UniProtKB/Swiss-Prot annotation:
Keywords: Cytoplasm, Heme biosynthesis, Iron, Lyase, Metal-binding, Porphyrin biosynthesis. It is an enzyme of class 4 (lyase). Fe cation binds at H214, E295. Transmembrane segments: none annotated. It comes from Burkholderia ambifaria (strain ATCC BAA-244 / DSM 16087 / CCUG 44356 / LMG 19182 / AMMD) (Burkholderia cepacia (strain AMMD)). Pfam families: Ferrochelatase. It catalyses: heme b + 2 H(+) = protoporphyrin IX + Fe(2+). The keyword Nuclease does not apply. Belongs to the ferrochelatase family. Its main location: cytoplasm. One of its GO terms (cellular component) is cytoplasm. This is Ferrochelatase. Catalyzes the ferrous insertion into protoporphyrin IX.
């Protein structure tokens, strides 16, 4: 095996610590070609699609990419921001927020972000850390709930990059923070602030709050993936923080792909059923998405909204994701700081002189 070239030992002697925020990824542009390139990488990950690759690659290349590339590009174009993809824009803002917060608290760390699919990728970010003299790395996935198809594959990519290094850094991983008090507080604050600006649902009159998490195939639950249980845990803690019960709030799962059974109840049919049952207002919040993206802005804000209205609902509210919210940046900083304990990340303080 050929290892990557190492920087000069004088650079490696900097003994710096790096924090790498890792999110899913996004196309570089809202065009069919860019979307197909992104989807090809994403859907070729055996952690994401757990069927024999020989069969799957034929279907992917001949049917799925040609059909979904153009359709998905139109959806991305509908949510694209002037600065670029929403997921990348908000992840960059989160990175800058954490960087500033840690620096203001005397942490001497390098903070950056990477995407599991697309760019900047994890290997590139770790290589940049190495060039900067980083010898300790904290991998911080932006997935509060652990899943093999998100958290584990992010770690896979990081470990694959490390396997090519002759001089490897120390590494720590943040596996999940689905029940972390600071994360739950940030979620509750996001909902409260939205209601303060747009009015609180009239729960006594039957209005509902729906907590929509990204779905995964049900078989992963049967095979031991803890994702479903952690989503339910987050949902229960958020309901408690908001003073709500399952009569006013429910947990659903979105973004089903293919014909296999996924975690239920499904978000879109649930919203249509609520509208048909006479629910006047439905608010939807996506606690598992730490940054707004195609699945929240387009799928929830447009497709699911249409389902609710078609069912007979009157008022639909999509509560924005955590994005760059002050409470969320604080929560990220707190979780990162907890996982940096024991590493020399602050400047040495001189001894007090009596």
């Amino acid at each position: 095996m050929r290892f990557d070239l190492e920087p000069p030992s004088s650079v490696a002697a900097a003994h710096r610590t790096g924090v790498l925020l890792i999110n899913l990824g996004t196309p570089d542009a809202p065009t069919p070609r860019a979307v197909r390139r992104y989807l090809a990488e994403f859907l070729s990950d055996p952690r994401v699609v757990e069927i024999p690759q020989v069969v799957w690659q034929v279907l992917l290349r001949t049917l799925i990419l040609p059909l979904r590339g153009r359709a998905s590009a139109k959806k991305y174009a509908a949510v694209w921001m002037p600065e670029g993809s929403p997921l990348r824009v908000y992840t960059e803002r989160q990175t800058e927020g954490v960087r500033h917060l840690l620096a203001s608290n005397a942490y001497q760390v390098t903070v950056d972000y990477a995407m599991r699919y697309g760019s900047p990728n994890i290997a590139q970010a770790l290589a940049q850390f190495k060039r900067a003299g980083v010898e300790r790395v904290l991998l911080m996935p932006m997935y509060p709930q652990y899943s093999a198809s998100t958290t584990a594959t992010a770690f896979d990519a990081a470990f694959a990059a490390l396997a090519r290094m002759r001089n490897q850094p120390e590494v720590r991983t943040v596996r999940q923070y689905a029940d972390h008090p600071a994360y739950i507080h940030a979620l509750a604050e996001q909902v409260r602030q939205y209601w303060a600006q747009h009015g609180r649902p009239d729960f006594a009159a039957g209005d509902k709050l729906v907590l929509s998490f990204h779905g995964v195939p049900k078989r992963t639950l049967d095979l031991g993936d803890p994702y479903h249980d952690q989503c339910q845990q987050t949902g229960a803690l958020l309901m408690a923080a908001l003073g709500l019960s399952t009569l006013e709030c429910r947990v659903t799962f979105q973004s089903r792909f293919g014909k296999a059974e996924w975690l239920q109840p499904y978000t879109a049919p649930t919203l249509r059923e609520l509208g048909a049952a006479g629910v006047r207002r439905a608010d939807v919040f996506c606690p598992g998405f730490t940054a707004d993206c195609l699945e929240t802005i387009e799928e929830i804000g447009m497709e699911v909204r249409d389902e609710f209205i078609a069912g007979g609902g009157q008022a639909f509210h999509r509560i924005p994701c955590l994005n760059g919210a002050h409470a969320w940046i604080g929560a990220l900083g707190e979780i990162v700081a907890e996982n940096l304990q024991g590493w020399p990340v602050k400047a040495a303080q001189p001894d007090m002189v009596n």
